[in-house]
Amino acid sequence: MRVLQLPALRDNYIYLLHNPDTATAAVVDPAVAEPVLEKLAELGAELVAIFNTHHHHDHVGGNRQLLERYPRARVYGSQVDRGRIPGQTVELKAGETVEFAGRLAKVLFVPGHTRGHIAYYFSESGDLFCGDTLFAGGCGRLFEGTPEQMVGSLDQLRQLPEATRVWCAHEYTLNNLRFALTVDGDNPDLQARYQQVAALRQTGSPTVPSTIGEERRTNPFLRWDQPALQAATGLQDPVRVFARLRGMKDQF
């Protein structure tokens, strides 16, 4: 299974999963259809599945147009998002699996950004498609969920193997790390990562994927139990530390 990263809109990433052996493909969070259709034509591949992480338009906006071209493609999403994902045919629950290219992805229920957010974790290849729950250096805003839910979701993700590749849905990394430095500025891993990311963005290069290990070391929203973040917020309870950090980032 090859993962192809397709930039879209201002800062979205769409992920096309390609199986060259069968000339089939699946797409994760198609914000728009055009780049997906172009890449499918280039590859000579048929779209067989659409994996949506949540219902926001910049993650499902291409569903209908893709289904017009590939009407047999199955559309996966959370059962909580029933009626909110265009063309949805499969309603998923936590712990279920989906298959592509002979590999199984476990469905992780990770609410907080939205109440029905899910992630797809391919353990064999070590690939996590986490939508807007976990970002490189940050996390999603709480539009529908609670801090308690988001901490539970992020804790679930930070326990995945350190080498797991984090394919998040937006190129927000540089700004996320600028904020991180305001609350964890003495962290040498964070300082080094910021320099690397700044250099990548100067050339227009993507900073995604990261890894779970990198996020654990440098992402303040996975470090609520670290003394530096507790000191920055003046709090110790994990949920309260997270909520304070999220509020600070919202105003950054």
Swiss-Prot record:
Free-text cofactor note: Binds 2 Zn(2+) ions per subunit.
Molecular function in Gene Ontology: hydroxyacylglutathione hydrolase activity; metal ion binding
Pathway: Secondary metabolite metabolism; methylglyoxal degradation; (R)-lactate from methylglyoxal: step 2/2
Record has Metal-binding as a keyword: yes
Annotated positions binding Zn(2+) 2: 58-59, 132, 170
Essential cofactor(s): Zn(2+)
Binding site residues for Zn(2+) 1: 54, 56, 113, 132
Catalysed reactions listed for this entry: an S-(2-hydroxyacyl)glutathione + H2O = a 2-hydroxy carboxylate + glutathione + H(+)
EC number: 3.1.2.6
InterPro entries in alphabetical order: Clx_II_MBL (IPR035680), Glyoxalase_II_hydrolase (IPR050110), HAGH_C (IPR032282), Hydroxyacylglutathione_Hdrlase (IPR017782), Metallo-B-lactamas (IPR001279), RibonucZ/Hydroxyglut_hydro (IPR036866)
GO terms (BP aspect): methylglyoxal catabolic process to D-lactate via S-lactoyl-glutathione
Keywords annotated in UniProt: Hydrolase, Metal-binding, Zinc
Enzyme class name: hydrolase
PANTHER family for this protein: HYDROXYACYLGLUTATHIONE HYDROLASE (PTHR43705), HYDROXYACYLGLUTATHIONE HYDROLASE GLOB (PTHR43705:SF1)
Subunit structure: Monomer.
Sequence similarity: Belongs to the metallo-beta-lactamase superfamily. Glyoxalase II family.
Free-text function comment from the UniProt entry: Thiolesterase that catalyzes the hydrolysis of S-D-lactoyl-glutathione to form glutathione and D-lactic acid.
Protein name: Hydroxyacylglutathione hydrolase
UniProt organism field: Synechococcus sp. (strain JA-2-3B'a(2-13)) (Cyanobacteria bacterium Yellowstone B-Prime)
